[in-house]
């Protein structure tokens, strides 16, 4: 699963990056709607969100971008990632209807607790989508077990505490955490600090898919003045991460 910030640095270059990811083997795109206080994200994604929002980018613009991706790459699942405020503002049910109409398959809203989601899970399912809750190593064991056995088809496992961006070491504690998240039979997406093929291979026997985001945003930032280089570097990294 590959993560992009919608509209960064422009819609066209964001689309170029998405095409590079798909051509490089990504079968799930996680598209982040820019938010002013992305509390789970590191400097690369925070900076991208800030730049896009300065242009006056709106939720409607992000959904239009997702719809374009869905029409261009119908074989690819699209997950929408953002924060609770963007979901609450238009109303949870209204937001979910709009997301589903744009082609969204699932929602990842990391600041909404799985058991106090203001009706997000029900609204997602009513519109043919899944809410994908986030599990973190900092969760108390009893609460983590409650999430694991809550019946969600998919759970996003944040592989360490803190924010996205810096590299994560895959060790025995990581594996024990993933075992705990999977205890109820949910399929697991593992992310936070994934940037290399070796990390992806180390996780491949325990997760449905790895999630990589900051590494792609950094490549986009480094090459935003050269679309050809942007495409080539993003595609090469996607190929590295999907070759197991």
Residue locations for each model-derived region?
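Conserved N-terminal beta1-alpha1 strand-loop-helix module at the mouth
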Residues: 1-75, 89-92, 229-239
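Conserved, mostly hydrophobic/aromatic
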Residues: 2, 21, 32, 99, ...
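Glycine-rich beta-to-alpha transition loops that act as phosphate-gripper elements at the mouths
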Residues: 5-10, 81-89, 113-114, 135-139, ...
């Amino acid at each position: 699963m590959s993560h992009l910030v919608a509209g960064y640095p422009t819609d066209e270059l964001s689309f170029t990056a998405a095409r590079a990811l798909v051509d490089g083997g990504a079968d799930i795109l996680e598209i982040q709607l820019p938010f002013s206080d992305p509390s789970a994200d590191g400097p690369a994604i925070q900076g991208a969100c800030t730049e896009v929002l300065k242009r006056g980018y709106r939720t409607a613009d992000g959904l239009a971008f997702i719809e374009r991706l869905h029409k261009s790459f119908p074989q690819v699942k699209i997950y929408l990632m953002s924060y609770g405020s963007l979901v609450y503002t238009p109303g949870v049910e209204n937001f979910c209807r709009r997301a589903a109409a744009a082609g969204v398959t699932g929602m990842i809203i990391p600041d909404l607790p799985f058991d106090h989601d203001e009706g997000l899970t029900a609204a997602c399912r009513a519109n043919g989508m899944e809410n994908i809750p986030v599990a973190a190593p900092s969760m108390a064991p009893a609460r983590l077990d409650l999430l694991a056995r809550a019946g969600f088809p998919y759970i996003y496992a944040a592989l360490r505490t803190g924010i996205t961006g810096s590299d994560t070491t895959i060790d025995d504690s990581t594996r024990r955490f993933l075992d705990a998240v999977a205890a109820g039979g949910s399929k697991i997406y593992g992310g936070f600090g994934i940037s290399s093929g070796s990390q992806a291979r180390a996780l491949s026997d325990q997760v449905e898919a790895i999630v990589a985001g900051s590494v792609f945003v950094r490549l986009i930032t480094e090459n935003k003045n050269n679309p050809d280089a942007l495409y080539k570097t993003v595609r090469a990294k996607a190929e590295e991460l999907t070759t197991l």
